[in-house]
From Swiss-Prot:
This is Lysine-rich arabinogalactan protein 19. Keywords: Cell membrane, Glycoprotein, GPI-anchor, Lipoprotein, Membrane, Proteoglycan, Signal. It is found in: Cell membrane. It comes from the Eukaryota. Residues 25-37 have a biased composition (Low complexity). InterPro entries: AGP19 (IPR038793).
Length: 248
C-alpha cells in the first residue's frame, strides 16, 4: 500500500513539473522586441497536443533502487488534469521582424600600460688624453760577447798545523791533613750468666702415665660422646613408641 501511494505521488509531481515547464516556456518572447507589432492571428490554432490520461500501470521497480524508507504518506491530492499547454501565436515566416544589430558584449575598459620611458642615453666617455710622442728608436743591439773562458780552480793548499795556546801552570798543591782513625763504639760485653740452682727430684705418679682422652670437636671427650649416642637412641625409641600409640 505504501509503495502504491509513493508511486502515485511521484506521478502527480512529474505531471505538475511538466505543466509548469510548459507554462514557463509558452509565453516566453523573443529576446529582442521589434518596433513593429505583428498583426493578431485571424484564427486561433487549436492545441495540437492533448494531455495524456494518467496511467494506472505501475512502472517496474529497478533492482538497483534502494528500499524505500518508511516515510509518512503525503496528504491525499485529488488527481486533476493538467492544463492545456499555451501555444505561442503563429507568426508568418515570410516577414521576420527586423532585428537590431547585435552590439558586441561590453568589455571592461582596457587600461593602456603607462608609456615606458626610454632608457637614458649613455654618457659619453671622457676624452682620451693625447697620445704621447713616440719613443725614439732603440739603438741597435751590441754584438754578442764571446763566452767567458772556464776559470781553473785554485790549487789546494796543505792544511797548516793548528797552534794550541800554552797550557797554564798547575796550581800548587795544598797540604792535606791526615785524619786520625776514629774509634768505633762497640757494645759492652754481656754479663756472665750465674749458674742455676739444682732442680728438685722428679716423682713418678701413676695418673700422669695414663693416656690422655681423645679430643672431641664438640668440646667433649670420647666417654661423653658414647653417652650422647645412648641418649639419642633412647629418645628415638621413645618417639617411635609414641607415634605407634597415637596411630593405634
Amino acid at each position: 500500500m505504501e509503495s502504491n501511494s509513493i508511486i502515485w505521488s511521484l506521478l502527480l509531481a512529474s505531471a505538475l513539473i511538466s505543466s509548469f515547464s510548459v507554462n514557463a516556456q509558452g509565453p516566453a518572447a523573443s529576446p529582442v522586441t521589434s518596433t513593429t507589432t505583428a498583426p493578431p492571428p485571424t484564427t486561433a490554432a487549436p492545441p495540437t497536443t492533448a494531455a495524456p490520461p494518467p496511467t494506472t500501470t505501475t512502472p517496474p521497480v529497478s533492482a538497483a533502487q534502494p528500499p524505500a524508507s518508511p516515510v509518512t504518506p503525503p496528504p491525499a491530492v485529488t488527481p486533476t488534469s493538467p492544463p492545456a499547454p499555451k501555444v505561442a501565436p503563429v507568426i508568418s515566416p515570410a516577414t521576420p521582424p527586423p532585428q537590431p544589430p547585435q552590439s558586441p558584449p561590453a568589455s571592461a575598459p582596457t587600461v593602456s600600460p603607462p608609456p615606458v620611458s626610454p632608457p637614458p642615453a649613455p654618457t659619453s666617455p671622457p676624452p682620451t688624453p693625447a697620445s704621447p710622442p713616440p719613443a725614439p728608436a732603440s739603438p741597435p743591439p751590441a754584438p754578442a760577447s764571446p763566452p767567458p773562458a772556464p776559470v781553473s780552480p785554485p790549487p789546494v793548499q796543505a792544511p797548516s798545523p793548528i797552534s794550541l795556546p800554552p797550557a797554564p801552570a798547575p796550581a800548587p798543591t795544598k797540604h792535606k791533613r791526615k785524619h786520625k782513625h776514629k774509634r768505633h763504639h762497640h757494645a759492652p760485653a754481656p754479663a756472665p750468666i750465674p749458674p742455676s740452682p739444682p732442680s728438685p727430684p722428679v716423682l713418678t705418679d701413676p695418673q700422669d702415665t695414663a693416656p690422655a682422652p681423645s679430643p672431641n670437636t664438640n668440646g667433649g671427650n670420647a666417654l661423653n660422646q658414647l653417652k650422647g649416642r645412648a641418649v639419642m637412641w633412647l629418645n628415638t625409641g621413645l618417639v617411635i613408641l609414641f607415634l605407634l600409640a597415637m596411630t593405634a
